[in-house]
Amino acid sequence: IIRLRKVLGKKNELSFAAGGFQKFLDQSVDWKKIMPLLDRVNIMSYDLVNGYSKVTGHHTPLYSTNEKEESTDKAITYLLKLGIPATKLVIGAAFYTRSWKEVSNTNNGLYQSGVHIGGPSFKDYSTAFSVSNGWKYFWDDKAKASYWYNDKEKKFATGDDIPSVKAKTLYVINKKLGGIMFWELQLDDKKNGLLDAIYQIKTAQ
């Protein structure tokens, strides 16, 4: 990083994407040494529950719902306490879901055992999670996170949607962070998409 900064100079941006889970934050980066050399860090605050997980959960929540659960706010709070300027911190949004099958209808499938099977992108939500196909939508107000459950198929899905992305954008503004990024643009809907939701909140402030 020192060599890159010397070559790039101060006018060119030098940044990187970092995992948003606590083990990575604790063990993988010497934050106090590298952040003075960097313009920003993009926190991948998604896949916090991923394809390796045998238990469902919010994969990109804004807030933790218990002491053990990872979240966007948990990562940001940790980095701010290290003294990293808020303007150098960028949070992440997921334009896709994580899904599991063989999930029991307890707590609407949330925090239950299951088998990960991937999940649809935001542009396909309206068809993939339709009521006619047996899906029900749920909002976790503590986590500020959306999820879906299909009792007939015993499937659970978690991901960002318009309400959760708006909540994240407001969080960025209120915390005076460096911004919000996402994976990835091609997964968004062409009309009334998640990027539109980010823009609406940003321009309304």
Q: Can you say where each PLM-predicted feature lies in the sequence?
A:
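Second-shell loop/turn segments in exported
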Residues: 60-67, 154-158, 184
